[in-house]
A protein has these predicted regions:
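Active-site and donor-binding regions of nucleotide-sugar-utilizing enzymes
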Residues: 1-99
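Short, surface-exposed amphipathic charged segments that create phosphate/polyanion-binding patches used
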Residues: 16-23, 31, 97-107, 160-162, ...
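Acidic, amphipathic alpha-helical patches
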Residues: 48, 134, 185-186
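Conserved catalytic-core segment of nucleotide-activated headgroup transferases in glycan assembly
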Residues: 80, 87-168
């Protein structure tokens, strides 16, 4: 099979693998569903909001999620047609990969970090000037402050405008504040930091994979 990655959730496929909150498995002859993230909301029964019964196979990342699935499996909408399997979390493969190590090295060189310790600010949603709170609280310390905003589409224009205004306010004003482009993989940003500040996103769970 030829493997294609796409942002178009309506793309027809022989085998479709989905991890979005909103999916369209009817466009695939055979469909596989994974969690969107490890911190997925609506626990313990996320399937009430994001049913799996329209998929052929479901994949959960570990024992915790297997137990959650088992507790809810009495409901028809929890059960994919061919079963649910505990197969791990795909992003964890990146943590020890040479590809990520190379990307992290390149990003460090690009940023030319000033200090040995780096604190990453990586929220899901930029609201209420929280980036400014982060910088004002920590900019006097001998640490690098890394800013990595999520790569939101223009549909969320209020959030993208908040991100834009925060960057205008801070970029170039501090010698220890470094901006990582929103398009950069969050895994690369996590690979070069020592501490993470985030909100309700999966970022914190993924940071734990780096030890």
């Amino acid at each position: 099979y030829k493997v294609t990655f796409t942002n178009d959730i309506f793309t027809p496929a022989e085998i479709g693998v989905y991890c979005q909150h909103v999916c369209h498995p009817e466009n695939s002859k055979f469909s596989v569903i994974l969690l969107h993230d490890l911190n997925q909301g609506h626990k313990p029964n996320i399937w009430e909001y994001e049913p799996w019964n329209k998929f052929d196979i479901g994949i959960v990342p570990g024992t915790f999620w297997t137990n959650l699935w088992s507790q809810c499996a009495c409901q028809y909408y929890v059960n994919p047609r061919c079963g649910t399997y505990e197969l791990g979390y795909p992003k964890s493969n990146l943590v020890s990969s040479s590809e990520l190590a190379q990307c992290a090295h390149a990003l460090r060189q690009k940023l030319n970090l000033k200090y040995d310790i780096s604190i990453l600010y990586a929220p899901s949603w930029e609201n209420d000037g929280k980036e400014d709170d982060f910088i004002q609280a920590l900019s006097s310390l001998k640490v690098n402050l890394l800013i990595k905003q999520a790569n939101w589409s223009d549909v969320y224009d209020n959030i993208t405008e908040n991100i834009h205004q925060m960057r205008l306010l801070h970029e170039g004003k501090y010698d220890n504040v470094f901006y990582i482009e929103p398009e950069e993989s969050i895994m690369t940003a996590l690979a070069i930091c020592d501490l993470v500040v985030s909100d309700e996103s999966n970022v914190m769970a993924e940071a734990l994979m780096f030890g």
